[in-house]
Amino acid sequence: IPLPKVNVKIVNPKDGQEQKYDEVGEVCFHAPNIMSGYFKNPKETDNIIKTHADNKKWIHTGDLGSVDQEGFLTFHGRIKKIYLTKGSDNNVYKLFPMQIENELIKNEEVLECGTIVVPDQEKIHVAIAFVRVKVGLEKETVRGKILEFARAHLPEHAIPKKIMLIEKMPYTQSNKIDYKKLEEKYQKENR
């Protein structure tokens, strides 16, 4: 963060311990001019402003991130958008929809990507990627290419169970992908 006297660290959301380089956790920051709290809402204030072992008050942003050895912060999504899933080895893994989107958008055929997470028949969370691709591409061929790309660039547990091609990505009034509409579309087409 390019501001003087602003400190940033990544902590484990479960125990508050500082993460090592390149480990994903909650982004927290401390500065001499942080807010004192939410107006008439001490409960929410206590959820976001916490005193750490250094006796400083830190803002817990609710964002997931990691810091590399050069000090660069990478944003990974929101804490509320973390799901648990099982890999083929039966181990439990964290599933980050934004990680999937960030990788799939690198594919040259992909114009936009929105990822939702749904339970499958075994009640395990799986990713469903909605993808808008360049006009004129053959659907099954491009779907296969995107899946192949996902297998090459994502951990096994994060590979979308299904790639759904979409002609127009739905957006909210604040110009963000409308994940509720994607969930509704998925439910409607998979009854």
Predicted regions and their residues:
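Conserved AMP-binding/adenylate-forming
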Residues: 1-72, 79-82, 101
